[in-house]
Swiss-Prot record:
Organism placement in taxonomy: Bacteria, Pseudomonadati, Pseudomonadota, Gammaproteobacteria, Chromatiales
Superkingdom of source: Bacteria
A GO biological process held by the record: lipid A biosynthetic process
Active-site residues per Swiss-Prot or TrEMBL entry: 242
Gene Ontology MF terms in the entry: N-acyltransferase activity
This protein's name: UDP-3-O-acylglucosamine N-acyltransferase
Keyword annotations of the record: Acyltransferase, Lipid A biosynthesis, Lipid biosynthesis, Lipid metabolism, Repeat, Transferase
Encoding gene per record: lpxD
Pathway(s): Bacterial outer membrane biogenesis; LPS lipid A biosynthesis
PROSITE patterns: HEXAPEP_TRANSFERASES
Coiled coil: none
Quaternary structure, from the entry: Homotrimer.
Function of the protein: Catalyzes the N-acylation of UDP-3-O-acylglucosamine using 3-hydroxyacyl-ACP as the acyl donor. Is involved in the biosynthesis of lipid A, a phosphorylated glycolipid that anchors the lipopolysaccharide to the outer membrane of the cell.
The species this protein was found in: Alkalilimnicola ehrlichii (strain ATCC BAA-1101 / DSM 17681 / MLHE-1)
EC numbers for this chain: 2.3.1.191
Amino acid sequence: MTETVTVSELAEGLGAELVGKPTRVIRRVATLCDAGPDAIGFCSNANYLEDLRATGAGAVIVRAEHVAECPTTALVVDDPYYAYAAVATRLHPAERPPAGVHPTAVVAEGVTLGEAVSVGPHAVVEAGARLGARTIVGPGCHVGTGVEIGEDSHLMGRVTVADRCVVGCRVILHPGVVVGADGFGFAKGPGKAGWRKVPQLGRVILGDDVDLGANTTVDRGAIDDTVLEEGVKLDNQVHIGHNVRVGARTIIAGNTVVAGSTTIGCDCMIGGSSAITGHISIADGVILMGMTGVTGSIKQPGAYASPLPAKPVREWRRNSVRFTQLDDLFRRVKRLEAAQSTGEGDGGDDGD
């Protein structure tokens, strides 16, 4: 379902300056290349100015410095991409399933369902769970005993929220998400006694406006809770270990792993396939480039990176061999420096 609005209505909603025809009707969003007169696009990068000049869009969201390049009605804002997100949400609102419990769903006694809650096919909601108003539990989901879910949250297909976990308002859990599985806790016995499982007694607490991508997993705490504060966004296939705390508005890209008992600050940006060791802390405002390995605490905000860029195979092999020789080279350089220092000293004495 799409909504039809005029450009002036969109500009008012965005607080944007309007340059052009205010009565033009917009029905959809589109790329600059594919947009027609009923569509709105955006340009947030100077690399796309050629596409902007040639666009057939009815309107375009642009920065002030690009208005002269825009051949159609312009909505002028500081951040076109951020504004585009609001416009796309308005023009293409998500469709809601009907309120109520599907005949194939299982809802235990003692469950509290808020107004207009939807529980989809084959979903299971265990005893004592509380679902806030307008929350959607999708097909095949499992909501454990005593779980609390706030208003306007959406569990898509096959999501698991395990016993006693807490999910805030307006939270989105994409297909396959698991919240509250046991953390990885085992104690090694003497000799060949093997490993003894350590009970994981904490919960997972997700703040308001958290978004977890498909097949992402967040383990429950061993004793204390695992906490993702408000506004945290995780991409697909991210793993958060037990007792981790992720600060508000931090965003983590796909395939990243955060080991147990690590604290990540607020407003951090973590690139894909990064690996963060356990029992460390990362300050507010840290940016980790993709594939960064973090083995110790980061105490100052800023950008950090550790991946090796791709090289031709032959060059990479030579450098790999040289890397194994670094210790020997270091010792040789130290000996040469010591010898040079001694020689310079002897030369000075002879001169006297």
